[in-house]
Curated annotation (Swiss-Prot):
The keyword Secreted applies. It comes from the Eukaryota. It is found in: Secreted; Target cell membrane. Residues 19-57 form a propeptide. The modification Alanine amide is found at A85. Belongs to the arminin family. GO terms for cellular component: extracellular region. Keywords: Amidation, Antibiotic, Antimicrobial, Immunity, Innate immunity, Membrane, Secreted, Signal, Target cell membrane, Target membrane. This is Arminin 7965.
Length: 88
């Protein structure tokens, strides 16, 4: 919501000080591009920090490996695997 209000405020300022429609259009385009680039930089910083956390050497690797399994996808196959293992 803050970015929306910032864009609207900057648009109002552009309309106030602009000399023509083209100036207003160019100003809005520049402000929107600037906001998009700032958001992308913030997201890339968050992604970089997540990558660093995942690459850290931590104990309990086996436990983390089990946690990372998507049980909703694997769950329906568990009874079949148990049945096959019991047959010999």
């Amino acid at each position: 919501m803050k970015t929306v209000f910032a864009i609207l405020f900057l648009t109002f300022i552009a309309f106030t000080y602009a000399k023509s429609y083209e100036d207003v259009k160019e100003e809005i385009k520049n402000e929107v591009e600037r906001e998009i680039f700032e958001d992308l930089e913030e997201e890339s910083d968050v992604l970089d920090s997540n990558v660093r956390e995942l690459n850290d050497a931590k104990p309990w690797r086996f436990r983390r490996a089990i946690r990372s399994i998507r049980w909703r996808k694997v769950g329906p196959y568990v009874p079949i695997i148990v049945k096959m293992a019991g047959k010999k």
